[in-house]
């Protein structure tokens, strides 16, 4: 019912969680739609703003480029206009100079010194000074009264510009001197034309040069005629018009080729290809006349520049208009710069958008992660509850089975019945072990494993692990050995259970896959070890020659200097390296470190089948094995190594391996533990520390072993018992060593004769059964030895050959461990074991006063057992009664409350956790509440201090009985007021450790 109810509650919570999640999902979708709309609007607005910025910058840069082009146009146009004016002024000055020449040599000389030929020659020779004039001529002023005499004097009649006789006029201006280039105008009256007449009259009235309107010259170029008055005398600038007319002698004129003038000018300047230059006569603004350039109207498209020219004639107006030949193109800067800014804006916008999107995504992810976290926490709680329930519900019936089998084995059984019961017990323990492994993996995944920190004896733990596999190793005939460096502290602080679990998993795997050779467990300090602590997981294939598994030859025994003579997977694990390590540890001074941390390097080496190359990458993957045949042939689930790796990492270490198919494997891991001071050891009651017997101190032994690694391991175990030893390789030098002759020396045991002779079984020859006994008797009779040494045979296998040997006092079975070796030596040497060093059946030492015995703790104690399972009640009651306790059982928490009303008779309560109606947690809370109330009443009571002192001590030790191995359950036990817990089924050692705190003699007293 409890499980079903829990499932219903879990379903309701799941439905509520789904509903909340649905609401959150709906809100999330609505927010997503709003966010998409806002993002779209923001993106469009940013693009439009960037485009507007591009347009503004483009307009500004284009205007700047146009303004710069206009300024350049103004500069170039004004430069050309000034140069044109300057050159025109120079030409006018030359005409003026020629007019002065005529006035000087024609009118001031009598007779005149100037004639046509002279004028023509002079004009031709000085024409280089007037490159812009196509020709010059001088016309004399002739009044009508003087016409006739003038014509007689010149020898020709005055003609009009049309070469017709000039009609009668007030005055005439016939050309009398001309440059040869325009000699065709000689005798023509330049005043016969209306415009020419006006220009001549204006010139003599102002005294300045005047210009005609542009016309086509004989060269087909556009040009103008410059007219300059010639006076008989020099006149001041303010001379009246009438005086100027009266003083006028004639007129000097020249034809200007304006097109040639401008062309020559433009050729002298750079940039002409870019400009179009036009020169206009704008005297009549409504009808401008082109003087140079094409006939383009003045309304020229921008940009253009107009410059007013001053040729010295105040009446006529001239302008120069400049414009670019080609249409101005948009400058690259007006395109590239705004485009670059636009790209930058878009990139910035993209970055902002990406950052904002990232922020939104992160925010959304955080929201989802928060929701997932809540779901994960809920799932974690559900998983913990599920694991607790499964652990309890699966282990409870199995514990009942194992408990009943224990009780059955305590009864009188036939041999066949006992064998059946023992077989069932082994199978049940194997199933419990498998369940524990699966639950351990689940606890690791749930993060529910916390390490203990209690003092423990590492060497004792290794001895216990070796004991577990001793029978299996003897059946297979393989060497199983342990060596712990003397530098490793005897007592360490850590989690002994988890350390034992790692070693057990690794040794168990080695036992499973090893059929010959050895399994060697070594423990060294990391500071002293140069072994494979950092070995990488990489395949080693037949000496790295690339052959596959089936190409690897099986190594033969005796060819390698290892524990058994078989080759090891890690080539560094040989006698040479082992000897160097031993020498280093022996010679090094004790190292005192400020840190209390101790880093151990533990290696488990085997000569088994190794790990195939294709499977080495998934060795630590849960439930994975090399192939499907592995489980069929060797059994197992493939979870042990995965759990070991996780535990090693939780302990702050690393695990690696080196494996070679058909050679073997070496697993190496590090573990970080702490040193333990003597006070912590003496005060601690958590772990029972079992000291080894001291009865063998001072004894010496001689060891016959041809394998130095194996001999070192044997010396290690003898040394633990205080026995010094010497090693010889074969049996022959043994007799010399025993007698101290033949140059033999006992380096390790001094001059003292060994009292025992230990011989390895593979050093025992076929005739030694007779010869050894005879030789020893002979040596005793000849007084070479005084006492016959006890002869022990060391054997790793149970064989008929060993059983038939009669010349030995005892056979010491392997694997060696100190306690078993001590027991064998006690019996063979006839040494009486002191009572304080004897152990009871449970493995606990009997104290001198018997306080260490579980039987002594429980004898006569009243214990209440609370469990809803009748089988468990029977098992618990039977176990406790076996140790002399008085047991009373109830099936519910309510019944327990009624029996535990203060005052009561019970010394201890064992409480199941999961029970219907009222579980163990709630029952414990109510018991503690009752005790607290009773203690308060006792404190307030006025009945006397003695009664108050007695009743104030009401605190019944309550221990949880649980098949649940989840850490959260243990924490809940402490939180509700329980004093500890014991696992079901009861294990004698653990039960002793749990109850001695409350029922020990120091407590009772």
UniProtKB/Swiss-Prot annotation:
Domain CHASE: 110-321
One Pfam family of this chain: Receiver_CRE1
Keyword Iron-sulfur: no
Membrane topology, from the record: Multi-pass membrane protein
Keyword tags: Cell membrane, Cytokinin signaling pathway, Kinase, Membrane, Phosphoprotein, Repeat, Transferase, Transmembrane, Transmembrane helix, Two-component regulatory system
Leader sequence segment: none
Effect of deleting the gene: Semi-dwarf, chlorina, late heading and low fertility phenotypes.
InterPro entries the record matches: 2C_system_His_kinase (IPR050956), CHASE_dom (IPR006189), CHASE_sf (IPR042240), CheY-like_superfamily (IPR011006), HATPase_C_sf (IPR036890), His_kinase_dom (IPR005467), HisK_dim/P_dom (IPR003661), HisK_dim/P_sf (IPR036097)
Cytoplasmic side: 1-37, 355-1005
Residue intervals of the Response regulatory domain: 700-829, 862-999
Annotated transmembrane regions: 38-58, 334-354
PANTHER family documented for this protein: HISTIDINE KINASE 4-RELATED (PTHR43719:SF77), TWO-COMPONENT HISTIDINE KINASE (PTHR43719)
Protein name from the UniProt record: Probable histidine kinase 4
Native source species: Oryza sativa subsp. japonica (Rice)
């Amino acid at each position: 019912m409890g499980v079903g109810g829990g499932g219903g509650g879990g379903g309701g919570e799941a439905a509520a969680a789904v509903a909340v999640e649905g609401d959150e999902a709906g809100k999330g979708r609505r927010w997503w739609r709003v966010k998409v709309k806002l993002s779209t609007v923001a993106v469009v607005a940013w693009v439009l703003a960037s485009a507007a910025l591009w347009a503004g910058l483009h307009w500004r840069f284009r205007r700047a480029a146009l303004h710069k082009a206009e300024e350049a146009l103004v500069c170039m146009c004004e430069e050309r206009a000034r140069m044109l004016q300057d050159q025109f002024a120079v030409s006018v000055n030359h005409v003026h100079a020629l007019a002065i020449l005529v006035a000087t040599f024609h009118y001031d000389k009598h007779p005149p010194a100037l004639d046509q030929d002279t004028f023509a020659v002079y004009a031709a020779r000085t024409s280089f000074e007037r490159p812009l004039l196509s020709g010059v001529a001088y016309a004399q002023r002739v009044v009508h009264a003087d016409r006739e005499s003038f014509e007689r004097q010149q020898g020709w009649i005055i003609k009009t510009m049309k070469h017709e006789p000039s009609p009668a006029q007030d005055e005439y201006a016939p050309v009398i001197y001309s440059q040869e280039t325009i000699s065709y105008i000689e005798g023509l009256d330049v005043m016969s034309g209306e415009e020419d007449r006006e220009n001549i009259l204006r010139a003599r009235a102002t005294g300045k040069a005047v210009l005609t309107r542009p016309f086509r010259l004989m060269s087909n170029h556009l040009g103008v005629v410059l007219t300059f008055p010639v006076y008989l005398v020099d006149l001041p600038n303010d001379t009246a018009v009438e005086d100027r007319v009266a003083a006028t002698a004639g007129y000097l004129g020249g034809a200007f080729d304006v097109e040639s003038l401008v062309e020559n000018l433009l050729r002298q300047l750079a940039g002409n290809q870019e400009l179009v230059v036009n020169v206009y006569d704008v005297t009549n603004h409504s009808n401008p006349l082109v003087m140079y350039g094409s006939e383009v109207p003045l309304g020229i498209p921008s940009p253009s520049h107009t410059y007013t020219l001053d040729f010295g004639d105040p009446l006529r107006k001239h302008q120069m208009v400049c414009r670019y030949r080609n249409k101005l193109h948009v400058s690259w800067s007006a395109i590239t710069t705004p485009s670059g800014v636009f790209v930058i804006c878009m990139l910035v916008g993209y970055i902002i958008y990406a950052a904002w999107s990232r922020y939104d995504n992160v925010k959304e992810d955080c929201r989802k992660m928060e929701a997932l976290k809540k779901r994960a926490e809920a799932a974690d709680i559900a998983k913990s509850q599920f694991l607790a329930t499964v652990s309890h519900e699966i282990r409870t019936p199995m514990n009942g089975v194992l408990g009943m089998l224990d009780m059955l084995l305590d009864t009188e059984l036939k041999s066949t019945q006992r064998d059946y019961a023992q077989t069932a017990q082994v199978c049940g323990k194997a199933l419990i072990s498998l369940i524990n492994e699966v639950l351990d993996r689940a606890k690791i995944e749930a993060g529910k494993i916390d390490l203990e920190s209690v003092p423990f004896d590492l060497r004792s733990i290794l001895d216990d692990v070796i004991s577990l596999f001793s029978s299996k190793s003897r059946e297979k005939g393989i060497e199983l050995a342990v060596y712990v460096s003397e530098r490793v502290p005897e007592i360490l602080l850590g989690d002994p259970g988890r350390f034992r679990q790692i070693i057990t998993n690794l040794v168990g795997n080695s036992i499973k896959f090893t059929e010959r050779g050895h399994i060697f467990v070594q423990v060294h300090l990391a500071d002293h070890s140069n072994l494979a602590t950092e070995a990488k997981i990489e395949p080693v294939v037949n000496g790295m020659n690339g052959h596959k598994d089936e190409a690897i030859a099986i190594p033969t025994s005796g060819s390698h200097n290892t524990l058994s003579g078989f080759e090891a997977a890690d080539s560094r694990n040989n006698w040479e390296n082992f000897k160097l390590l031993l020498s280093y540890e022996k010679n090094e001074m004790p190292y005192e470190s400020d840190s209390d941390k101790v880093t151990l390097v533990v290696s488990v080496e085997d000569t088994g089948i190794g790990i195939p190359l294709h499977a080495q990458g998934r060795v630590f993957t849960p439930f994975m094995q090399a192939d499907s045949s592995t489980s069929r042939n060797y059994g197992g689930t493939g979870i042990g190594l995965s759990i070991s790796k996780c535990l090693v990492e939780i302990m702050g270490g690393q695990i690696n391996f080196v494996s070679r198919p058909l050679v073997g494997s070496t697993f190496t891991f590090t573990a970080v533990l702490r040193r333990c001071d003597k006070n912590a050891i003496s005060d601690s009651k958590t772990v029972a520390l079992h000291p080894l017997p001291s009865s063998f101190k001072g004894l010496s032994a001689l060891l016959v072993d041809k394998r130095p690694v194996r001999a070192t391991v044997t010396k290690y175990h003898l040394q633990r018992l205080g026995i010094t030893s010497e090693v010889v390789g074969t049996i022959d030098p043994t007799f010399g060593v025993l007698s101290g002759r033949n140059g033999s020396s006992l380096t390790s045991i001094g001059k003292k004769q060994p009292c025992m002779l230990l011989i390895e079984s593979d050093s025992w020859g076929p005739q030694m059964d007779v010869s050894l006994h005879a030789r020893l008797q002979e040596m005793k009779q000849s007084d070479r030895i005084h006492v016959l040494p006890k002869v022990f045979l060391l054997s790793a296998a149970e064989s008929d050959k060993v059983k038939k040997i009669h010349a030995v006092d005892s056979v010491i079975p392997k694997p060696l461990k100190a306690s078993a070796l001590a027991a064998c030596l006690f019996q063979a040497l006839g040494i009486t074991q002191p009572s304080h060093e004897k152990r009871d059946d449970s493995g606990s030492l009997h104290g001198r006063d018997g306080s260490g015995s579980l039987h002594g703790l429980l004898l006569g104690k009243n214990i209440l057992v609370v469990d809803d399972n009748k089988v468990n009640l029977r098992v618990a009651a039977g176990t406790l009664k076996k140790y002399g306790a008085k047991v009373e059982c109830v099936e519910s928490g309510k019944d327990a409350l009624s029996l535990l009303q203060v005052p009561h008779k019970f010394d201890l309560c064992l409480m199941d956790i999961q029970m219907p109606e009222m579980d163990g947690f709630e029952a414990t809370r109510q018991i503690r509440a009752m005790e607290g109330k009773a203690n308060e009443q006792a404190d307030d009571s006025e009945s006397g201090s003695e009664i108050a002192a007695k009743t104030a001590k009401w605190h019944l030790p309550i221990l949880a009985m649980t098949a649940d191995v989840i850490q959260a359950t243990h924490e809940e036990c402490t939180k509700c007021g329980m004093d500890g817990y014991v696992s079901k089924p009861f294990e004698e050692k653990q039960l002793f450790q749990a109850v001695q705190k409350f029922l020990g003699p120091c407590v009772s007293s």
